């Protein structure tokens, strides 16, 4: 009788302890789910560029390449060592500046 009672008491203690402490797999899964939720919340937020209207639009990288192609119809062949990438990325370039720098014959 005493051993049955001891066995029952130890089983009850182990059961209650395991209910209070999540297993390692559960805590990892919960952590991963929280990280995924945080990432999706960050993705759904609007970027600053879309939240705040900008006064001027600057062309850098791919945007500059597309701007040159739409203005000249061909890749840029710079005149007199003009660095249009630096100029257009720091200030707003006009189509006339792009034509003068890249394709003056057009």
Curated annotation (Swiss-Prot):
GO process terms (BP): dauer larval development; negative regulation of dauer entry; regulation of synaptic assembly at neuromuscular junction
The keyword Signal is assigned to this record: yes
Cell compartment(s), UniProt: Secreted
Pfam families with a match to the protein in the record: Ins_beta
S-S bonds: 60-89, 72-102, 76-103, 88-93
GO-annotated cellular components: extracellular region
Top-level taxon of the source organism: Eukaryota
Gene3D superfamilies: Insulin-like
Position of the signal peptide: 1-19
Keyword Nucleotide-binding: no
GO MF annotations in UniProt: hormone activity
Chief place of localization: secreted
Organ and tissue specificity: Expressed by ASI and ASJ sensory neurons and weakly by ventral cord motor neurons.
Record's function text: Probable insulin-like peptide which negatively regulates synapse development at the neuromuscular junctions. Probably acts as a daf-2/InsR agonist ligand to prevent dauer formation under optimal environmental conditions.
PANTHER family in the record: INSULIN RELATED-RELATED (PTHR33893:SF9), INSULIN RELATED-RELATED-RELATED (PTHR33893)
Family membership: Belongs to the insulin family.
Name of the protein this chain belongs to: Probable insulin-like peptide beta-type 1
Taxonomic path: Eukaryota, Metazoa, Ecdysozoa, Nematoda, Chromadorea
